[in-house]
From Swiss-Prot:
<feature type="disulfide bond">
    <location>
        <begin position="444"/>
        <end position="457"/>
    </location>
</feature>
<feature type="glycosylation site" description="N-linked (GlcNAc...) asparagine">
    <location>
        <position position="427"/>
    </location>
</feature>
<dbReference type="GO" id="GO:0050731">
    <property type="term" value="P:positive regulation of peptidyl-tyrosine phosphorylation"/>
</dbReference>
<feature type="glycosylation site" description="N-linked (GlcNAc...) asparagine">
    <location>
        <position position="140"/>
    </location>
</feature>
<dbReference type="GO" id="GO:0001525">
    <property type="term" value="P:angiogenesis"/>
</dbReference>
<dbReference type="InterPro" id="IPR037579">
    <property type="entry name" value="FIB_ANG-like"/>
</dbReference>
<feature type="glycosylation site" description="N-linked (GlcNAc...) asparagine">
    <location>
        <position position="337"/>
    </location>
</feature>
<dbReference type="GO" id="GO:0007165">
    <property type="term" value="P:signal transduction"/>
</dbReference>
<dbReference type="Pfam" id="PF25443">
    <property type="entry name" value="ANG-1"/>
</dbReference>
<dbReference type="GO" id="GO:0062023">
    <property type="term" value="C:collagen-containing extracellular matrix"/>
</dbReference>
<dbReference type="InterPro" id="IPR002181">
    <property type="entry name" value="Fibrinogen_a/b/g_C_dom"/>
</dbReference>
<dbReference type="InterPro" id="IPR036056">
    <property type="entry name" value="Fibrinogen-like_C"/>
</dbReference>
<keyword id="KW-0037">Angiogenesis</keyword>
<feature type="glycosylation site" description="N-linked (GlcNAc...) asparagine">
    <location>
        <position position="158"/>
    </location>
</feature>
<dbReference type="GO" id="GO:0016525">
    <property type="term" value="P:negative regulation of angiogenesis"/>
</dbReference>
<dbReference type="GO" id="GO:0010595">
    <property type="term" value="P:positive regulation of endothelial cell migration"/>
</dbReference>
<feature type="signal peptide">
    <location>
        <begin position="1"/>
        <end position="24"/>
    </location>
</feature>
Amino acid sequence: MLSQLAMLQGSLLLVVATMSVAQQTRQEADRGCETLVVQHGHCSYTFLLPKSEPCPPGPEVSRDSNTLQRESLANPLHLGKLPTQQVKQLEQALQNNTQWLKKLERAIKTILRSKLEQVQQQMAQNQTAPMLELGTSLLNQTTAQIRKLTDMEAQLLNQTSRMDAQMPETFLSTNKLENQLLLQRQKLQQLQGQNSALEKRLQALETKQQEELASILSKKAKLLNTLSRQSAALTNIERGLRGVRHNSSLLQDQQHSLRQLLVLLRHLVQERANASAPAFIMAGEQVFQDCAEIQRSGASASGVYTIQVSNATKPRKVFCDLQSSGGRWTLIQRRENGTVNFQRNWKDYKQGFGDPAGEHWLGNEVVHQLTRRAAYSLRVELQDWEGHEAYAQYEHFHLGSENQLYRLSVVGYSGSAGRQSSLVLQNTSFSTLDSDNDHCLCKCAQVMSGGWWFDACGLSNLNGVYYHAPDNKYKMDGIRWHYFKGPSYSLRASRMMIRPLDI
């Protein structure tokens, strides 16, 4: 940029000098000197000559004076025509002009040099402050960059040192992972071996199962053949049973006739007997109304005794518990070993069955006669297969007549056999296999088995099927008491007994 400014200033000075020289030349020309102008390219040369006499006429020349002058200078023939004095003057003028031009050149150079130095000094002074500011800014930026580079170098060194410190741990972790990988590969190989062994065993099992299946199919075919033969035999047996049933119906008719005769005979004997003691009672044997009277008479041992129930044709053997919870209890039901079948009809449950010393049902009619003449309470004792015992006691107990379907009525529950009664308290009729009196279309006596006071199958049934442990669970038709062991647990033992309230 400085060189361009210097060149510009030099050009301006040269123009000024040239204009000054031209002005001087014009002034001298005005003084009476002749001028000679020579044009060479972009340059123009002016020569001052003294005035001379007119030249002799010559050939016609071009109107262009510059061209004429150049040709007169270049052509020696024309110069030869000039007078010698004029030539000398011209040469002298040329020399003077040359010297003057050299002086002018030196002067111009001197002036330009001084002017250039001044301009350079001024420009240097004008640009020193910005350059200093620029240098300071560059220095600050350089310092900041150096600091950043120093920080980055320190961070890099820290990271490098941390990586160097972590290299042993990384190496150990890598070794550990390699060892684990080897162990996993070994385990995988072991599992592959076990898998192949299992596949072989599976193939062997499949082969064995196919063989067993073939054997089962063969046995099935044999069983089907046997079943067809047995079906034919059963058909023959059914035919025989029809004949036996026919004979049995005849025997039942005869038995019914005999029973009627026996009742008539007993009626006749009773009419002739003494009112205080029936004729068929053994001499010396004392008869009581229930076990409470037996205990009041002085008996203290529990066992089988004879009682005379009102409206009964003969005395009944009953089991009296004279020790439990104050005694005086007359047993009306006992289950303890499953020796007696409780899947009975209405008539059996009415008259009673079993042995009073063991499993038995005293009979609905006897219980009705006992509870008809006095107010009784009921006690139910239960035992599970784990040896746990519980009881349920009802303060008032009454059983209706046969016309009332031996309807049950109990009031005042207490005991340890559940938070509430598993026995329906009021107006529940008795049902058996052949007399469905429950409030359900499903015939609970057939589904739950036995005879009981079912109310939509209810929460209890102590006359169900006797199941021995461990087959006593999940049995809906077993000996059940819901609030003691749940709805499907069949109990080990149960007792039902009654006694008068005035005791």
